């Protein structure tokens, strides 16, 4: 039984069997969520291309996620493979150790493993960070929300999370008991992707993480934007994701996700995040964004920041709250322009992290992402591209992975996957998961 496919137990009482279910044996809280909005829904059998499971339809929120600039959330045709073909691809590549992908793929150039020693950046190389070797414990949080019954219902998000579960456990050695899935086809109250459950699961993901651990976060669902309040977004808008109960509990803002999943991490801890949602280019507020040529797209955020900015960055990296608050006061005084607008590029320096955080997102901040379907197997286009590229060619550099995902999508979609990082990276390093 996959996580999230537990027997219906949601009757406004505490879940009786949560302790014995996958993903909850490793410190994940089994307490009843603070906010409950659903009662036991009717069950309806739905058959997929190679599997059959029960969708539990939840009453929709009072309002759908906001309409995007392009109108209704698009569901164009796409070439996602069937479940059985996908599994065979993984097994064949895993067994054969295939390195080279299809002839049209970009092959990694001088790919090598990340260094184990501490790295330095910033003025006079005073700010330290560390790559993860991904040899420690592996944990994953997979969230897929279809928003059943709403005006902007999606069809592939839950499939995305199950496909990702198969991929992580079959190809990369993640253990089922170290994976938590939140889907809106379950009646287990602790597995419904409400805002409270999502925030709690994010905290579980990063709790007690140690150097060389590998954490994986996957979100497939609706994304949007709201007004930026801290000056860290170039377009003046914060990116958000939508829990199933967003109308009553609100959305989750990128600043909060950064504070929960990035800020607490030690140097040498890897967090790989994959967002298959609209307007997700900077959804984790990571300061470095890379182009398909392997160069930083943004100006150097350390330039002309001065001593106050450096002190703030170092305080952030070491968790020194008192020093951080003091330094930030000087930073904001320094970087406020004559027209009282904040220099956003300089504000970004407080988002630096000494941990090894990598994010692939399905689109730029001003783009939508596609929900695709073929032969009854629905999927998000970005999730499909990520799984397809790595199953065809398991050994990739960061640069070749980004290039090949874009190549997979370019013939059918306008969205452009993005690569963002918590620190500068050598994009020719081998991508580890």
From Swiss-Prot:
Residues 1-123 are annotated as: Disordered. Pfam families: Peptidase_C14 (PF00656). Coiled coil: none annotated. GO terms for cellular component: cytoplasm. Its EC number is 3.4.22.-. Residues 9-44 have a biased composition (Low complexity). InterPro entries: Caspase-like_dom_sf, Metacaspase, Pept_C14_caspase. The keyword Transmembrane helix does not apply. The keyword DNA repair does not apply. It is an enzyme of class 3 (hydrolase). GO terms for molecular function: cysteine-type endopeptidase activity. Keywords: Apoptosis, Hydrolase, Protease, Thiol protease, Zymogen. Residues 45-55, 83-109 have a biased composition (Polar residues). One of its GO terms (biological process) is apoptotic process. The active site is at 222, 278. Involved in cell death (apoptosis). Belongs to the peptidase C14B family. This is Metacaspase-1. It comes from Kluyveromyces lactis (strain ATCC 8585 / CBS 2359 / DSM 70799 / NBRC 1267 / NRRL Y-1140 / WM37).
